[in-house]
Design a protein with these regions (language model features):
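Active-site-adjacent structural elements that line small-molecule/cofactor binding pockets in enzymes
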Residues: 2-297
Length: 297
């Protein structure tokens, strides 16, 4: 099966983010910025993915995004996310202006608060994020080029009212449904979802746990999962099988496509897939295997 015929999913030009030259498409690639090269970005573009999301706190000077934009012609580059505790908003706004001048309509700035456990300055993140958005927009970053990392209803509301939308991380489709209810019909909703190409469930879960497990020690993620009904038993250790199955799509390309489509059915506009492989493995063959099942090539 392919995803292309599975649902209508087009709210069209009523969406402010959709009226720009930027087109994300239904599926993009999420990958840690340190693992992305210009050659990989060009390969992702050739396969038909609409966006490349630079994860794990890419630098706010946006130099890498600019380099990747130079290496591609149509791919949207996005940050997921610039950490507001690590980069001053005035500097990020100036960097955004530089990138926008050189590559108009192809860059989406994702910002957020990161994790309490990883950031010494982390305090009152909602108020700090709202102020950060104030400074970015005063510095010329337009609302339709700004998205926020958001999990709970308060920050989702900020993403609805002050930005183009939200980019939730480590969420099942049930969260997407709740997030769309908070955002309403207009704003962009682009959740991240992990993927393992392996038809052996035990092996797939084992590989998925290598990426999920560290996040189960982070309060923002566990609090969000508890809001969704997951229990302490699910969240203990490296996560229950049911939790891993909800957070990591695995199986054949067709089976994975069906799992990712649940986000679209729940109200997402775009899904950022994070392919998990053995350390050091080239992800491009996996992207190539997934693209036809996702209706991309």
């Amino acid at each position: 099966m392919t995803v292309s015929g599975s649902r209508r999913h087009s709210r069209g030009a009523t969406e402010p983010w959709a009226s720009s030259p930027r087109r994300l498409g239904r599926f993009g690639i999420w990958r840690s910025a340190s693992l992305v090269t210009p050659e990989l970005a060009a390969g992702i573009e050739r396969l038909g993915f609409g966006a490349l999301w630079l994860g794990s706190s890419p630098a706010g000077d946006l130099a890498q995004a600019e380099e990747l934009l130079e290496a591609t012609t149509t791919l949207t580059l996005a940050t997921s996310i610039v950490n507001m505790w690590q980069d001053q908003p005035q500097d990020v706004a100036r960097s955004f202006a530089r990138v926008q001048r050189r590559h108009p309509g192809r860059f989406l700035l994702g910002v957020g608060a990161g994790h309490r456990e990883a950031t010494q300055q982390y305090a009152r993140p909602y108020q700090a994020l709202a102020r950060y958005v104030d400074v970015l927009q005063a510095g010329g970053v337009p609302r339709d080029s700004l998205v926020l990392a958001a999990l709970g209803p308060k920050v989702l509301g900020l993403a609805r009212d002050r930005a183009a939308g939200a980019i939730p991380y480590l969420v099942p489709p049930g969260h997407t449904r709740q997030a769309r209810a908070v955002l309403g019909p207009g704003p962009l909703l682009a959740p991240e979802h992990k993927v393992v190409l392996d038809t052996d469930p035990d092996q797939a879960r084992a590989l998925g746990r290598t990426t999920v497990h560290p996040h189960l020690g982070m309060v923002n993620y566990t609090s969000n999962l508890r809001r969704l009904g997951w229990t302490d038993d699910d969240l203990s250790g490296s996560g229950s099988d049911a939790l891993i199955d909800a957070l990591v799509a695995h199986g054949s390309p067709a089976e994975i496509a069906a799992q990712l489509t649940r986000h679209l059915d729940a109200g997402a506009d775009h899904v950022c897939l994070q392919l998990i492989t053995d350390e050091g493995a080239d992800p491009l063959p996996g992207y190539r295997a997934l693209a036809p099942a996702l209706g991309l090539s």
